[in-house]
From Swiss-Prot:
Residues the entry annotates as binding CTP: L7, A8, G9, G10, G81, D82, D83, R84, N85, H86, S87
UniProt-recorded name of the protein: Ribitol-5-phosphate cytidylyltransferase
Pfam (any one): IspD
Any one of the GO BP annotations: cell wall organization
UniProt site (Positions ribitol 5-phosphate for the nucleophilic attack): R160, K217
Repeat as UniProt keyword: no
Organism: Staphylococcus epidermidis (strain ATCC 12228 / FDA PCI 1200)
Metabolic or biological pathway, per its Swiss-Prot or TrEMBL entry: Cell wall biogenesis; poly(ribitol phosphate) teichoic acid biosynthesis
Keywords, ordered alphabetically: Cell wall biogenesis/degradation, Nucleotidyltransferase, Teichoic acid biosynthesis, Transferase
PROSITE patterns (alphabetical): ISPD (PS01295)
Enzyme class, spelled out: transferase
Gene Ontology terms for molecular function: 2-C-methyl-D-erythritol 4-phosphate cytidylyltransferase activity; D-ribitol-5-phosphate cytidylyltransferase activity
Site (Transition state stabilizer): R14, K22
Role played: Catalyzes the transfer of the cytidylyl group of CTP to D-ribitol 5-phosphate.
């Protein structure tokens, strides 16, 4: 079985003084998250699409799905967690309430505020996760990356050709991800907030899938302006 987990737990503090969490803001006349859900519905192999959102916004999300005629039977809205990984675990728990997981079940996790993912990205995530167990979507780093231990002086300049910027989706064999997460101590859970990093720290392989520069995460007013420019350019979905 193939599941999608759309992570819509953020409140959008970096977006400034806005009336709604960032995932519900309008992008070309339609909420950002609706664009994202539509992209997932275009990939026909999902058995279930689960949206994790703050408790007080669940009914709002359900109303949006109804208003945009996306009340598909495969879509479910649940309460998100305190952080990203907690939300993913809530999604997995939701799946387990009605299905016994097997070793090959896969979950494609994705930021609700990345509405420009493509069918190609989803397809390759699923294919490689089936083969390797875990996948991260990345793009090559364009700028030179500088590291600093004190925010005052350079402590290192990594080789740019070895640097990538992480995007989403991140895709996993569900049982492997859950078992890895549950093996962590509480302090490790607080530090390892990225699901792929959990597997890397445990010495497990994570396959790279090529993302797209336009697969941006909308977290600031500038990002929203860029997103509006992208969408008016009619970016293809494949």
């Amino acid at each position: 079985m193939i599941y999608a987990g759309i992570l819509a737990g953020g409140i959008g503090s970096r977006m400034g003084n806005v009336p709604l969490p960032k995932q519900f803001l309008s992008l070309q006349g339609k909420p950002i998250i609706i664009h994202t859900v539509e992209k997932f519905l275009m990939y026909k192999d999902f058995d279930e699409i689960i949206i994790a959102t703050p408790q007080k916004w669940i009914n709002y999300m359900l109303d949006l799905l109804n208003n945009y005629q996306l009340d598909d039977k495969k879509i479910k809205v649940i309460q998100g967690g305190d952080d990203r990984n907690h939300s993913i675990m809530n999604i997995i728990e939701s799946i387990e309430q009605h299905k016994k997981l097997n070793d090959e079940d896969i979950i494609v996790t994705h930021d609700a505020v990345r509405p420009f993912l493509t069918n190609r990205i989803i397809r390759e995530n699923v294919e490689y996760a089936s083969q390797y167990g875990a996948v991260d979507t990345v793009v090559n780093a364009v700028d030179t990356i500088i590291s600093s231990n004190d925010a005052q002086f350079i402590s290192g300049i990594p080789i740019r050709s070895e640097m990538y910027q992480g995007q989403t989706p991140q895709t996993f064999k569900i049982k492997e991800l859950k078992d890895s997460y549950l093996s962590l101590t509480q302090s490790q859970k607080e530090i390892l907030t990225d699901a792929c990093k959990i597997l890397v720290e445990l010495g497990k392989p994570v396959k790279l899938v090529k993302g797209e520069l336009f697969n941006i995460k909308i977290t600031t007013p500038y990002d929203l302006k860029v997103a509006n420019s992208i969408i008016t350019g009619a970016v293809d979905n494949d």
